[in-house]
Amino acid sequence: MKHTLTLLSLGIALTIMAQNKKTDIAKTQLVEHLSVLAHDSLEGRETGTIGLEKAARYLVAHYKKIGLKPFAANGSYRQWYKLPYAEDGMTTDKASNIIGMIEGESKPEEFVVISAHYDHIGKTATDVYNGADDDGSGTAALLAIASHLMEEKKQGRGLSRSVVFIAFSGEEKGLWGSEFFSDHPTFSLKKTTADINIDMIGRIDTERNKADTMNYVYVVGNNKLSSDLHPLLDETNAMGHQLVLDYKFDSPFDLERIYYRSDHYNFARKGVPVLFFYDGMLLGDYHQLTDEIEKITWELYKKRVDFITDLLKNFANRTNMLKRDIPLND
């Protein structure tokens, strides 16, 4: 009996150690996915075009390969919506958000969302805007994180809450996809503890000019909607990441109004606590032909993805959902 208890105690200890160990996402996965998403053949992934549809099919294929659970009754990962208006170059009047889930072990009816947008701004007659950072980097990370968490689940280290992976379309047009989703959610937003949104995490802010340039990430939203957000960020960082978490865009004097400019905002307006991870690349290559995969800072990109994955795990495994105790105050 004593021998059995010793083995049981050892097993519990090893499980706790595994859960507290810093995540190590395979860089090769990030490279593989981003090489496809930022390729000329996807024609800049503009909403309403065949390029976006090619990207959507790639995402659906990998959701299936990973084994994510679809929400639609017909087994589809797609949430279709009609485009608010047509623009020159569009070949269809609809687009889709790509939604899949890893079901939670003990609280499957509660959710953590991780989101990115897979659209970009398209092409001209002669050039393609590949959007490697914006937001190929977030979309590639979404797939790599999903693969990692599914593998952990198969090894008996599943998370308590369900994790929902959403690749939004229409972000560049005005947050179309996430607005439609938040008005027509496929699961309860009241039971959603948080949205972690990743939009541009593969580059550096060329205006930063600080010694920590290769070890930072901008975090937006830590002082809004929930007082639990900041402590959980610090707790996750102490797991061995030691990233510089820069909150400059949470200033009420932020002239760029970054908090309102990506898909997380459509969760926030519904009362869901959000965090937005961002590299700050506002100048230089932002929405330019030069936003190419060759300029991705791979080691820093991977550091950020590892941190975001561990934060997601902490959100999913904590005893209670995040408090909703701070008004948004638009």
Language-model segments: which ranges?
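Acidic/His- and Gly-rich active-site-bordering loop/insert found
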Residues: 37, 83-122
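Metal-dependent peptidase/peptidase-like ectodomains
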Residues: 168-270, 274, 323
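Alpha-helical metal-binding/catalytic segments enriched in His/Glu/Asp
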Residues: 98-100, 114-174, 308
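A non-catalytic alpha/beta surface segment that caps or lines the substrate-entry region
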Residues: 45-102
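His/Asp/Glu-rich mid-to-C-terminal helical/loop segments that flank catalytic regions of hydrolases
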Residues: 279-330
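N-terminal capping segment at the start of a domain
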Residues: 25-54, 66-72, 279, 285-288
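Second-shell loop/turn segments in exported
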Residues: 20-24, 40-50, 86-88, 126-135, ...
